[in-house]
UniProtKB/Swiss-Prot annotation:
Keywords assigned by UniProt, alphabetized: Carbohydrate metabolism, Cytoplasm, Glycosyltransferase, Transferase
Protein name according to UniProt: 4-alpha-glucanotransferase
SUPFAM superfamilies with a match to the protein in the record: (Trans)glycosidases
Gene that this sequence comes from: malQ
PANTHER family: 4-ALPHA-GLUCANOTRANSFERASE DPE1, CHLOROPLASTIC/AMYLOPLASTIC, 4-ALPHA-GLUCANOTRANSFERASE DPE1, CHLOROPLASTIC_AMYLOPLASTIC
GO molecular function: 4-alpha-glucanotransferase activity
């Protein structure tokens, strides 16, 4: 009886009773996992909401019938107020359904039900069927752009890390060569007080920006500050700066120390202002409200905590009195350190303003997409977002991936999941706010691990990933809200749908107008016959690789496998041998396809095992995806420069310097290089030809 009750409770909470393992067989979830995941959820909080005649939120598709079932008995009067203030009225009997007016506009409306002195409210969300698509894509153009890890950019002026100044310059260079966008890694807020926690996919908050990307050279108060300029002229400053700039790997600690020193001095001058700039800053702070304030408070408090003890990596390691955002001690800290909090507010304003200026540049060059941002799948356990909202995040669990052949224990990403019951109890407000924050100043948003809108692999805290289970999310409602916000922001959506993709979400994503992600390396069958360029789906973005995969040279030379062996990533020699054999077959299949579809000169070799990477082969591989039917093409500067080293190796942390490897050339020299310019001209021409072949 007890086990039946547990199974029912787990099912009701959205916990799947089993999953399909790497061998294609159903595997049951243990009672202990169900128990611990139920314990991790805040279901009791979510269900505390009083039972009402209507749910707290309903989501509908525009133009379709909108039935509303009213629970209870007796007569109710209803009043529907649209976002614009238009009102509709009527009466309904409890236990029956009625249809909301079909002419309801898209948006967020409020339904109020009244009976005697009792009132119930329902948020009514009316959404379009599909996400926004730019006119260029509706006109069947084939667009291309650069996919960039911003921190990897080198330039003659930056401070040892790619910044918003570099992004601005690169947008101009890409636009002039026919490119339509620059795609970015997540630029979410990280940890100024813990700069070595550098993964863009383990952010402190997804609502705010990473202040390391501020271009200090573009900050007026840095140039106006005598103190800052005296510091700038010091030989030690210039020497440290040059070392950071020349390094092949981003030195986050040095770069952060340099930027924070300069910006602290600049802030002293800005804080004295009483002008339009100060008014704009204050207005930004007022408009962004509590969420921004607590981000700044977190960063200020974190900086103080790390000064006292550098092991205080995040709020779970702080003294208990500072672990709760509502504690009197936190309030007192904010009052006593008002200038510090204001400094971090200012940094967010600077980052926002500089990123907005990049967007303006892209629009000035009439780039159809301009910038595309990346939304990480979650936030880190000890960051600002979990500190501010303990109820929304389930800290007794983390997300990851189930076991597979390469990783028999699965993957644990160390990110606490959002509680689907709390998201619904709050009428989807956390999801809406997240989209709004990330759809600003861009023409596209890439959603990392888009399957998370349907389900996430939850792992009880402290366990390995093989002890996890899938937890379901309200996918239809979330996709509808995604379409509404996408349309409002004129921001198209790309869903990263690699790995295990459940059949039920594929159709939903396509019909919602979410663009798929097609990686050249994976577009083949069991015989290693590669998908023809013309067979790529139009509603997709084609790329050769991603930040988690080897570059073209790395792939062809099996550098990723060699490195994986050195780092001990594979369970045994048998697995590794199988991977090498698989790669050789894939390379031959790829080479055959390059010849078959005219991407290589006829004189080029036909036997992959005898061919090394050459400029001709590199160009041929990029031509293959340039010829594809995909509406979008993402190219990596690493491949323009024929680089071999990866920027990230999944499954490693301390074993490899992830998120640090820079490009091998500065932006200035890359765009002055004849080889790069000829390559981009060739690929741009082929994209235009691919559009005409339709």
């Amino acid at each position: 009886m007890e086990s039946k009750r547990l199974d029912n409770a787990a099912l009701a909470a959205g916990i799947s009773p089993n999953y399909i393992n790497a061998h294609g067989k159903p595997q049951s979830i243990s009672a202990e996992t169900k128990r611990r995941l139920l314990d991790a959820m805040h279901q009791r909080t979510a269900t505390k909401v009083a039972v009402t005649p209507v749910p707290n939120v309903m989501v509908y598709t525009s133009g379709k019938k909108m039935p509303m079932v009213v629970e209870g008995s007796g007569e109710y009067s209803w009043l529907l107020t649209t976002e614009e203030g238009t009102q509709y009225k009527g009466h309904v009997t409890g236990g029956k359904a009625f249809n909301l007016p079909t002419k309801l506009p898209e948006g967020y409306h409020t339904l109020t039900l009244t009976q005697d002195d009792q009132r119930a409210h329902c948020r009514v969300i009316v959404a379009p069927k599909r996400c926004y698509e730019p006119q260029a894509l509706l006109n069947k153009q084939k667009l291309w752009g650069a996919c960039v890890q911003l921190y990897t950019l080198r330039s003659e002026k930056n401070w040892g890390i790619g910044d918003f100044g570099d992004l601005k310059a690169m947008l101009v260079d890409v636009a002039k060569r026919g490119g339509s966008f620059i795609g970015l890694n997540p630029i979410h807020a990280l940890y100024p007080a813990n700069p070595e926690s550098a993964s863009p996919y383990s952010p402190s908050s997804r609502r705010w920006l990473n202040v390391i990307y501020i271009d200090v050279n573009a900050v007026e108060d840095f140039h106006l500050s005598e103190e800052a300029q005296a510091w700038w002229q010091l030989p030690t400053t210039q020497q440290t700066l040059q070392q950071a700039r020349d390094a092949d790997w981003v030195d986050y600690s040095t770069v952060t120390a340099l930027k924070m020193t300069a910006l602290r001095m600049a802030w002293k001058g800005f804080a004295q202002r009483d002008d339009e700039q100060m008014a704009a800053f204050r207005q930004f702070v007022a408009e962004q409200g509590d969420s921004l304030f607590w981000q700044a408070a977190f960063d200020a408090l974190h900086a103080q905590q790390v000064k006292e003890d550098e092991m205080r990596w995040g709020w779970p390691a702080w003294p208990e009195m500072y672990q709760n955002v509502d504690s009197p001690e936190v309030r007192q800290f904010c009052e006593e350190h008002r200038d510090d909090v204001d400094f971090y507010l200012w940094l967010q304003w600077l980052a926002y303003s500089q990123f907005a200026a990049c967007w303006e540049i892209s629009q000035g060059y009439e780039m159809p997409i301009g910038l595309y941002r990346d939304l990480a799948v979650g936030v880190a356990e000890g960051g600002a977002e979990t500190w501010c909202d303990r109820e929304l995040y389930c800290l007794k669990a983390s997300v990851g991936a189930p076991p597979d052949i390469l990783g028999p224990l699965g993957q644990n990403w160390g990110l606490p999941p959002m509680d689907p019951h709390i998201i619904t109890a709050r009428a989807y407000e956390p999801f809406i706010e997240l989209l709004r924050a990330n759809m600003q100043n861009c023409g596209a948003l890439r959603i990392d691990h888009v399957m998370s809108m349907l389900r996430l692999w939850w792992i009880p805290y402290g366990e390995t990933a093989d002890q996890g289970a899938y937890v379901h999310y309200p996918v239809d409602d979330l996709l509808s809200i995604l379409a509404l916000e996408s349309k409002r922001h004129r921001c198209m959506v790309i869903g990263e749908d690699l790995g295990t993709v459940p059949v039920e979400i594929v159709g939903k994503l396509r019909s919602s107008g979410v663009y798929s992600y097609k990686v050249l390396y994976f577009e083949n069958d069991h015989e290693k016959t590669f998908r023809a360029p013309k067979a790529y789906p139009e509603q997709s973005m084609a790329v050769a690789a991603t930040h988690d995969l080897p570059t073209l040279r790395g792939y062809w030379e099996c550098g990723d496998l060699t490195l994986g062996k050195t780092l001990g990533l594979y369970p045994d020699e048998v697995v590794l041998r199988g991977l090498y054999q698989d790669r050789e077959l894939a390379k031959q299949g790829l080479l055959d396809a390059l010849h078959k579809y005219g991407c290589l000169p006829k004189r080029a070799g036909h036997k992959a095992s005898l061919m090394s990477m050459t400029p001709t082969l590199n160009r041929g591989l990029q031509r293959y995806i340039a010829d594809s039917n995909s509406a979008l093409l993402g190219l990596q500067p690493e491949d323009w420069l024929d680089m071999a080293e990866p920027v990230n190796i999944p499954g490693t942390s301390y074993q490899y310097k992830n998120w640090r490897r820079k490009l091998s050339a500065t932006l200035e020299s890359m765009f002055a290089d004849d080889g790069v310019n000829k390559l981009l001209k060739d690929l741009d021409r082929r994209r235009r030809a691919a559009a005409k072949k339709k």
